[in-house]
Amino acid sequence: MGDYLVKALAYDGQVRACAARTTETVGEAPRRHQTWPTASAALGRALTAGSMMGAMLKGDETLTIKIDGGGPIGTILVDSNAKGEVRGYVTNPHVHFELNEHGKLDVARAVGKNGMLTFVKDLGLRDFFTGQVPIISGELGEDFTYYFASSEQVPSSVGVGVLVNPDHTILAAGGFILQLMPGTEEKTIDQIERRLQTIPPVSRMVESGLTPEEILEELLGKGNVKVLETLPVAFVCRCSRERIADALISLGAQEIQDIIDKEGYAEASCHFCNETYHFTKEELKQLKQLADAKKA
């Protein structure tokens, strides 16, 4: 079963819901960035939340999430879009601690609680939509929940989880977002709250083989969920050799000549996917000609 998410309504439209399986997507974190387990869990939770929040967008709209809690992990940055594509990185990938008192990876200690959670949505308008809230727990699920309630005024529950194997690969990852629509009945809220208190962690549900549809049934009850859309989820980076070449051209002919004289080659790495692009002296000379032509 590949990674995917489902968008759904429940309780006759009173609840908007999304659930995702992101095991392979999150698995790109240790593969691309050599993240240690606690860092993998933190970045994986952010990637999972980003994929689900991106799925709430439309068309070519995009979302950037910046998590900076002042902890040893540094900054987590995640980009996502409406197509189920997500990418991300963490400033300090080599962070790992002993399990916390609950027997889980200590994401809160890695992320920290002295900072902000920032969301930037590019909706294709003149200005970006920006929302920012203080980080209240560092576990991220609670922090995303607080963002929805505080910045978007939507009562929500967000759960994200990652299980890491002893060899640092990803065993299971996934998440859910539940949102109450205006006018939701009290009995519906009570039922959901009771279920949230009794269900296993979402990462354990994914590990046991539950699909996103089945996770929503665990959360909301069988027969209450109406799936609206299914969307593949994947780690996809928008970087390319052409984009890096354009960036070099934008430096100008003189700057490119300086690189040729001093280094004889150019090398650039993408923060998001860790892909490295190499340009030989001959290729740089061609880019210099293009920069000259552009200036003319």
Curated annotation (Swiss-Prot):
Post-translational modification: Under oxidizing conditions two disulfide bonds are formed involving the reactive cysteines. Under reducing conditions zinc is bound to the reactive cysteines and the protein is inactive.
GO molecular function, one term: unfolded protein binding
Disulfide bridge positions per record: C237-C239, C270-C273
UniProt-listed Pfam families: HSP33
GO cellular component: cytoplasm
UniProt-annotated location(s): Cytoplasm
Primary site of residence: cytoplasm
InterPro entries assigned: Heat_shock_Hsp33, Heat_shock_Hsp33_C, Heat_shock_Hsp33_N
Biological processes annotated in GO: protein refolding
Keywords of this entry: Chaperone, Cytoplasm, Disulfide bond, Redox-active center, Zinc
Domain of life of the native organism: Bacteria
Family: Belongs to the HSP33 family.
Role of this protein: Redox regulated molecular chaperone. Protects both thermally unfolding and oxidatively damaged proteins from irreversible aggregation. Plays an important role in the bacterial defense system toward oxidative stress.
PANTHER family assigned to the protein according to its UniProt record, in alphabetical order: 33 KDA CHAPERONIN
Protein name (database record): 33 kDa chaperonin
Organism field: Geobacillus stearothermophilus (Bacillus stearothermophilus)
